[in-house]
Design a protein with these regions (language model features):
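Glutamate identity and glutamate-enriched acidic tracts
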Residues: 5-8, 50, 98, 131, ...
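Left-handed beta-helix
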Residues: 72, 77-78, 83-84, 89-98, ...
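Terminal amphipathic alpha-helical/low-complexity segments used for targeting or macromolecular assembly
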Residues: 1-72, 183-192
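Conserved beta-strand-loop-alpha-helix hinge in the C-terminal portion
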Residues: 166, 171-186
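Intrinsically disordered, low-complexity regions enriched in small/polar residues
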Residues: 5, 19, 89, 106, ...
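Serine/threonine-rich low-complexity intrinsically disordered regions
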Residues: 2-5, 18-22, 148, 159, ...
Length: 192
């Protein structure tokens, strides 16, 4: 990841919270929004991790990042591949596998688990598309493909692939409509 890519990812994240990219808005969100502050440090640690020139700063950045992980209950690794526009509206109990892939402009609500399955026919890691809304308490694990603009309902356990623009609900998750995430995803800045 290059510096300008880091800047684009952070700008896209900030835009999801504020709806604009003014510096004052970004600074205000950094101060008042735990979700944006965490995603900023997560992306910064990921950038430092990939550049050996900056490895000397990684332990210091990691301390701040880890403190925010513990304080707000975010279990999202800085090594995870997440597109720009990550929106964390609530904190507490969000766990994402370090090898999961999450697209651009996605919402992760509280108590979401996106995990890897190490055995069985679903062995693998989830791949989440762009503009996906994942509701509170949802669980997605294994080699699951979640299509673009899908919505996963609260407490839904996803055990099979989710088509594009589908709305999943229940345990195990079933498609209940094809209205997608349009009403849940706001302030997108394109695909970063």
């Amino acid at each position: 990841m290059r510096y300008f890519e880091l800047r684009e990812l952070i700008n896209a994240d900030a835009y999801r919270y504020t709806g604009n990219n003014r510096l004052t808005s970004r600074l205000a969100q950094f101060i008042i929004s735990p979700g944006f502050r965490f995603s900023w440090w997560m992306r910064f640690c990921g950038y430092l991790h990939e550049h050996t020139v900056w490895h000397i700063l990684l332990p210091l950045a990691w301390l701040v990042y880890h403190r925010l992980q513990v304080k707000f209950g975010y279990g999202i690794s800085y090594k995870c591949k997440i597109g720009g526009g990550l929106y964390l509206p609530h904190y507490g109990g969000i766990n994402v596998s370090e090898i999961a892939h999450i697209g651009s402009n996605c919402n992760l609500s509280q108590l979401v688990t996106i995990g890897v399955s190490r055995r069985g026919e679903m062995m693998g890691v989830p791949v989440i598309g762009d503009e996906v809304y994942i509701g509170p308490g949802a669980v997605i694990f294994g080699a699951i493909q979640v299509g673009d603009r899908a919505a996963i309902g609260a407490n839904c356990v996803v055990t099979k692939d989710v088509p594009e623009s589908a709305v999943m609900a229940g345990v195990p998750g079933k498609v209940i409509s094809y209205e997608g995430s349009a009403g849940y995803i706001h302030n997108t800045l394109g695909r970063a």
